[in-house]
Amino acid sequence: MSKKITLIVLAFFASIFLVACGKSPDVTANANGTKIGDTIKIGVNMELTGAVAAYGKAEQNGIKLAVDEINKAGGVDGKKLELVTKDNKSENAEASTSSTNLAIQNNVNAIVGPATSGAVAAASLVSQKTGVPLLTPSGTQDDLTVDANGTKKFVFRTTFKDSYQGKVLAAYSYNNLNAKKVVLYYDNASDYAKGIADEFKREYKGKIVTEATFASGDKDYQSALTKFKDLDYDAIVMPGYYTETGIITKQARDLGIDKPILGPDGFSDAKFTELAGKKNASNVYYVSGYSTNVALSDKASGFIEAYKKAYNTDPNMFAALAY
């Protein structure tokens, strides 16, 4: 079975509500998101369809569960939370459009999402212009919350950064798995994957036997994997999303490659195992900000129980971070 390299223990869940106290100096749009009406309007900008819909759907579930609990408890300062949801279709341009619509047309007070770094980067430009805060549960690209002028005033996250994942993968492979020689195989079309790969190269103490890339949407990895098969190495480090890495893992195992495979939080969905095949997902390790294999607080245990009751499935990292 695959194993999680857990970085964050869910000892306590907190529902975070962000309201901008003032407008950014570069506000150029007619957003009224700082004005609270009869309800507190929370925009949800998520990947509900498209390539990485599994992330967005899990986060939407976590958000809905949190809002239901808050509203049943009386809301915030006596006001109920109201969700306004947009599907960004796993497309960066659509993520920007969704944020614009939520801020300008729907006049939300804050936006949760998107889930993926590229979509967050696009959507965050809208928040910086309108002053409507954006909170991403899982956008890990290092520069999402900072720019040349320092920390962005209206962009927040509840997860770790790509550079941290790269450090963890470098340390875990070398120290825990005793992998002194690795193959580095990553998605060159993804800033997320490239950021993790770059940090891994800076931090890894062993030898990178070969470095190769694939692109989002690829389906056939036989050529690269066949080359890897005859090399002398201890593990494959594979930054990318489950949409590709699940397929790569299956094809690698089918070719007889049984070396450990390590990846980032992009592996952290049941779809990875579905694409790889359950028997092929053994000796696989990935970074996660969530695990049930640690001591949990009453709040965390309550979340898991409530999530199972509401959705008839276990929550994953993305659901937990959004909650």
State each model region's role.
Residues A95, R157-K181, K194, D220-Q222, ...:
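Hydrophobic alpha-helical segments within soluble ligand-binding/sensing domains
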Residues A252-Y323:
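Extracellular/periplasmic periplasmic-binding protein-like sensory domains
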Residues P25-M46, K72-K80, Y174-K180:
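Immediate post-signal peptide segment of exported/extracytoplasmic ligand-binding proteins
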Residues P25-A31, A54-N61, A73-V146, F214-Y221, ...:
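Beta-alpha junction/loop-to-helix N-cap segments that form part of ligand/metal-binding clefts
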Residues G33-G62, K86-A93, A115-T116, Y185-K194, ...:
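Extracytoplasmic "Venus flytrap"
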Residues L48, K152-S216, A235:
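An alpha-beta-alpha
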Residues N106-A115, L135-P137, K181-Y186, D232-Y242, ...:
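Periplasmic-binding protein-like
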